[in-house]
Amino acid sequence: AIAMRLAVTQPDLVRGLVIARPAWSILAAPANMRPNAEVGELLSSMRPEAARQAFAASGTAQRLAAESPDNLASLMGFFSREPSVVTAALLASISRDGPGVDADQLRRIAVPTLVIATGMDLVHPLTMAGELSRLIPHTRLTEITPKGVDRKAYVAEFRDALDDFLKGRCSSPGACTR
């Protein structure tokens, strides 16, 4: 979201744009950010261990365990982050936030753009990446192996996609699509 905003507000500073696992497109407080908000709400109303247990028993955690285990692992990590009051406020703020750009502004981005995304990621959905790749001209959408499937492949494919983009190997349509 920050990189998109910079590309829109300070285009003279941007030669290329990389958007990795986007959680926002143009709307603030998208539904995919709700799990972060839930964790923040629990941390603001309970002690961290009780909040962790409540979240682990929730429908959200069960869905994440089945569909997006890496997201669940990340969210569970917030319960041990100190100070918990700051973590709660940060999660609430991030969940309500947005990129502060609209579709017309994204359509005016005039630099090569790489969007990297994975399946099995409910907080950073592949559909969000697809939406951004349709809105921003000169975009290559690269889908890589989800961390929850194979972390080593995820890291290697992420690195390769970024390397290809930065070396200018993504100049033709589909060149960076796996």
Task: State what each model feature region is.
Residues 122-128:
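Conserved alpha/beta-hydrolase "acid-adjacent" motif
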Residues 4-45:
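Flexible "cap/lid" loop of the alpha/beta hydrolase fold
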Residues 14-15, 136-139:
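Core-facing hydrophobic residues within beta-strands of well-ordered domains
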Residues 70-102:
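Hydrophobic, aromatic-rich cap/lid helix
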